[in-house]
Amino acid sequence: MIDTNIKGLVYTTRLLLPRLIAHGRGASIVNLGSVAGNYPYPGGNVYGGTKAFVGQFSLNLRNDLIGTGVRVTNLEPGLCESEFSLVRFGGDQAKYDATYAGAEPIQPQDIADTIFWIMNTPAHVNINSLELMPVSQTWAGFAIDRNRG
């Protein structure tokens, strides 16, 4: 997770940045964060930490690129139905199904459509961050242990 969400992001950005800067005005970077980077949940410490990194990296990169015309956005999806949960649950289809049961989660196409919209905003507009959640989800995820006296 750290290799993909942090190192992969940094190395890929470093590789592509010279071309984006050369392109100038209208060039765009859309990083995929997560609402887990803003709102903790039980069992999400490493994942949430890596996605918090994506958010700070994006904001700092935007500052570093001021004057270049390159835009930087951190897109932060919430509950999205994808193979991510199947991998997370070690292939347990029942847990995967339970994660999305009755929730009408975001679909990968929703995220793709949002990225398309971000990329097609006017060149003078930068969307710093954007949270995207299904209407069935909220960020009020406080964990409460009700089994303690």
Task: Please give the residue ranges for each predicted region.
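Active-site loop immediately N-terminal to the catalytic Tyr-X3-Lys motif
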Residues: 39-45, 103
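Active-site helix of classical SDR
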Residues: 13, 50
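Residue(s) in the substrate-gating loop at a strand-loop-helix junction
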Residues: 34
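C-terminal helical subdomain
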Residues: 74-78, 93-141
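Alpha-helical segment proximal to the catalytic Tyr-Lys
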Residues: 18, 63-66
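A short helix-coil junction within the Rossmann-fold of NAD(P)-dependent oxidoreductases
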Residues: 15-26
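A hydrophobic alpha-helix adjacent to the NAD(P)-binding/active-site core of NAD(P)-dependent oxidoreductases
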Residues: 1
